[in-house]
UniProtKB/Swiss-Prot annotation:
Family: Belongs to the KdsB family.
HAMAP family linked: KdsB
Protein name stated in the entry: 3-deoxy-manno-octulosonate cytidylyltransferase
NCBIfam families per UniProt: kdsB, PRK05450.1-3, PRK05450.1-5, PRK13368.1
GO cellular component, one term: cytosol
Length: 249
């Protein structure tokens, strides 16, 4: 295949409902969004990392670090709509959607989600999944942990906050997967995302990836064995701070 241009887009907003201003929360001397950007910079397959935000405060912090920033509308209904707007004036073949609250993202996972686009017959979109084991029973029933089921070609059939698949008699954990919210999109697919508008299942589950599923786009799921915590709550933030301190000690 000919070389392709790949750009990482990081959506970032201040008005998080569960942890306000989390993007600027300090993690060992740097804001959370800066830590995520630093990890993204280590990807070996991308040529640019861009912050997409509607916050002048976030924009100022990131520009001071030397990051590329695109200002977006405050009306975006989800992170993918925000990066779709940012992508309108960026020349790339593939865009990676990396959530801004992932300061411990493994750069290898970023490269892993890109790899389906370096092969023949690339999908419309790709994402990562992590296998749930027997001791992860609680995770299967946690609505804050998104589960996914796939077909025989590892394409997503459905995502849900409910247990997937439902176990009628036994807990077959070896075939249960949690979804990791990083995506790569063909440029044309990303640009069509906002045009479709929120779908019925997307609104029911509050999962933006279901907009793609309902509209017939393929989402290739790539399994990873590295799953680091994101930051959605104050408890998550304290855990990430402890992990950063342990790395430095």
């Amino acid at each position: 295949m000919p070389p392709i241009n790949i750009v990482i887009l990081i959506p970032a907003r201040l008005n998080s409902s569960r942890l306000p201003n989390k993007m600027l929360a300090d993690i060992e001397g740097a804001p959370l969004i800066v830590r995520t950007w630093q990890q993204a910079q280590q990807s070996s397959l991308t040529r640019q990392v861009v912050i997409a935000t509607d916050s002048e405060e976030i924009a100022g912090v990131m520009k001071a670090c030397g990051a590329d920033v695109v200002m977006t509308s405050p009306d975006a209904r989800c992170g993918t709509e925000r990066i779709a707007e940012a992508a309108e004036n960026i020349d790339a073949d593939v865009f990676v959607n990396l959530q801004g609250d992932e300061p411990l993202i493994d750069p290898g996972n970023i490269d892993l989600v890109i790899k389906p686009f370096l092969q023949e017959n690339p999908p419309d979109c790709s994402t990562l999944v992590y296998r749930l084991l027997a001791e992860d029973y609680a995770a299967l029933h946690d609505p804050n942990i998104v589960k996914v089921v796939m077909d025989s070609q590892s394409n997503a059939l459905y995502f849900s906050r409910s247990p997937l698949p439902y176990q009628r008699e036994t807990y077959a954990a070896t075939r249960c997967f949690r979804h990791i919210g990083i995506y790569a999109f063909r440029a044309g697919v990303l640009r069509m995302f906002s045009e479709h508008g929120p779908s019925m299942l997307e609104e029911a589950e509050s999962l933006e990836q279901l907009r793609l599923v309902e509209n017939g786009y393929s989402i290739r799921c790539v399994e990873t064995d590295v799953d680091m915590p994101g930051v959605n709550t104050h408890e998550d933030l304290e855990l990430v701070r402890r992990l950063y301190r342990s790395r430095r000690s």
